[in-house]
């Protein structure tokens, strides 16, 4: 249905963790699975003894555009199946494992909440460690249990509300370059990839926030060694052949490259961390207020363990912190381009809060003042746009594994209890956040107003989980939302965004856009999330507002 425009590979990777993990899971599990114990679980169709549910997967994928992601394929099938609360899929012969897709908010809560048995919720799937080159093996993303608790406690000061407000200046400073790039494209009328601009902006912000380093992602030819190394490492990771056993991959040239770049990045990050810690110890007033530096306060000795945790956590934020924000911005631009009522409501709110001057500099001047927190808090409709965008297009998911013999039990809405030991448990936010029981006939529509007024109270909190929920909810989610809010405040009245290619707006014989019965502009084709990362292009052409066109191939 919906193709994630300009989707970056990291988000695809996160969304596919439950699947990719199975390709490498021989590192952690081998042997046959006794499927009889799960025979009573909801399944899409009868399982083939030799091929599991792959016949169903292949049939489902064949009905529609082959580029669409597995989440979209799953969503299509779940609707046909009547929205079961869970769905068990046998992944043989890929691997002798089962995936339990969690499709109901009440069941998902049981997976992500704490319990007497699991103090930080059900553990992450071991396949998460395969992401170590990108997110670190000792980071918030990959750790579990008490070590995760201790690290999270150290990291939290960098994400407190008052500290986040102090970062508005950083966001505005980096957004200035972003806006300049848009202005240049508008003047030249060039086609360009908007994901490059949004991703570079997000990189620049997360670099300052995480370890107070200028990554210079938006300045060609001046990118920092951290950024260049990380991107080279990312490309090498993407080139990894995950269908091969890890031992067969280990001696390949690409794996040697990954290990070399992994070590290089680790050395650079640790050198920066050690310098900041030394400043703290000697009481140097120039010590930064970055997440990494704040996490080191009160630590007299920088042990190898703490140094590695901090380095890996910086890497994890570099990975997750840039892509989530970039994707969110792109989807918001697209939805506003096809919803004239939402765009008008947003612009009216910005006029009311910042005054009628649409120039980004006028907004920037006010947000640099002491009352920026109050100004941002008044942007209720902007908040609703962000929340609705994340509802329709959640940036990631989670994959958990209930240990064998743990007796982990999930209770379905009808009271039935399922013992899920040994299963991969993955709540699918894209489906949960489109539950017709909660969101009704507008489940697939962009309706920011649903989050405003009395009706918002009818939406259970657990039905909105784009950053997941529970103690392992994405730590930087509020930073991402604030960054997008600031960007929208600066540019929403300056630029018009129009999609071309897949999802392009339709027009009548006079070239005028056509409103459908729901008040959205009609499109020539539907847009859907893709299963592989494919960069898209955009074009800006100058007018009173610059018109940004997203171009799909």
Predicted regions and their residues:
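Conserved cytochrome P450 K-helix E-x-x-R motif and the immediately C-terminal K′/meander segment
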Residues: 61-82, 362-414
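Short, small-residue alpha-helix embedded
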Residues: 324-337, 487
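Conserved cytochrome P450 K-helix/beta-meander segment immediately N-terminal to the heme-binding cysteine loop
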Residues: 427-455
């Amino acid at each position: 249905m919906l193709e994630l425009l300009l989707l970056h590979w990291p988000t695809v990777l996160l969304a596919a963790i439950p699947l990719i993990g199975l390709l490498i899971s021989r590192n952690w599990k081998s042997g046959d699975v006794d499927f009889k114990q799960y025979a009573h679980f909801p399944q899409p169709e009868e399982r083939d003894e030799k091929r599991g549910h792959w016949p169903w997967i292949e049939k489902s994928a064949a009905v529609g555009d082959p580029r669409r992601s597995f989440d979209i394929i799953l969503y299509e099938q779940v609707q046909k199946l009547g929205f079961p609360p869970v769905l068990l899929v046998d992944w043989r012969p890929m691997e002798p494992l089962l995936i339990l897709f969690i499709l109901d908010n009440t069941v998902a809560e049981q997976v992500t909440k704490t319990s007497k048995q699991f103090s930080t919720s059900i553990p992450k799937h071991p396949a998460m460690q395969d992401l170590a080159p990108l997110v670190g093996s000792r980071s918030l993303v990959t750790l579990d249990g008490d070590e995760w608790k201790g690290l999270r406690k150290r990291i939290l000061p960098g994400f407190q509300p008052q500290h986040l407000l102090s970062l508005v200046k950083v966001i505005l400073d980096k957004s200035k370059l972003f806006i300049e790039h848009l202005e240049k494209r508008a003047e030249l009328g060039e086609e360009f990839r908007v994901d490059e601009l949004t991703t570079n902006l997000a990189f620049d912000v997360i670099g300052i926030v995480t370890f107070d380093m200028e990554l210079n992602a938006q300045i060609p030819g001046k990118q920092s060694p951290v950024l260049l190394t990380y991107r080279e490492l990312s490309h090498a990771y993407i080139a990894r052949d995950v269908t091969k056993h890890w031992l067969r991959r280990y001696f390949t040239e690409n794996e040697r490259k990954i290990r070399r770049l992994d070590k290089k990045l680790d050395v650079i990050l640790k050198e920066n961390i050690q310098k900041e810690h030394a400043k703290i110890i000697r009481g140097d007033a120039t010590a930064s207020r970055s997440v990494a530096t704040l996490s080191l306060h009160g630590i007299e000795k920088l042990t190898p363990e703490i140094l590695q945790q901090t380095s890996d956590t910086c890497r994890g934020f570099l990975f997750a912190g840039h892509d989530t924000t970039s994707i969110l911005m792109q989807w918001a631009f697209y939805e506003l381009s096809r919803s004239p009522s939402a765009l008008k409501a947003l612009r009216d709110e910005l006029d009311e809060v910042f005054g009628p001057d649409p120039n980004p500099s006028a907004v920037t001047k006010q947000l640099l003042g002491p009352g920026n927190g109050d100004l941002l808090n008044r942007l209720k409709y902007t908040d609703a746009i962000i929340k609705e965008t994340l509802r329709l297009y959640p940036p990631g998911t989670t994959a958990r594994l209930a240990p064998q013999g743990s007796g982990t039990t999930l209770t379905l809405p009808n009271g039935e209890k399922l013992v899920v030991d040994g299963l991969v448990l993955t709540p699918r936010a894209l489906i949960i956040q489109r539950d017709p029981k909660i969101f009704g006939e507008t489940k697939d529509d962009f309706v920011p107003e649903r989050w405003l007024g009395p009706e918002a109270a009818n939406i259970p909190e657990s039905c909105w989980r784009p950053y997941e929920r529970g103690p392992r909810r994405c730590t930087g989610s509020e930073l991402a939302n604030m960054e997008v809010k600031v960007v929208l405040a600066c540019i929403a009245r300056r630029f018009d965004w129009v999609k071309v290619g897949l999802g392009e707006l339709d027009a009548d014989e006079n070239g005028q856009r056509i409103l459908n019965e729901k008040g959205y502009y009609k499109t020539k084709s539907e847009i859907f999330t893709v299963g592989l990362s494919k960069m898209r292009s955009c074009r800006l052409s100058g007018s009173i507002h610059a018109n940004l066109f997203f171009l799909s191939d």
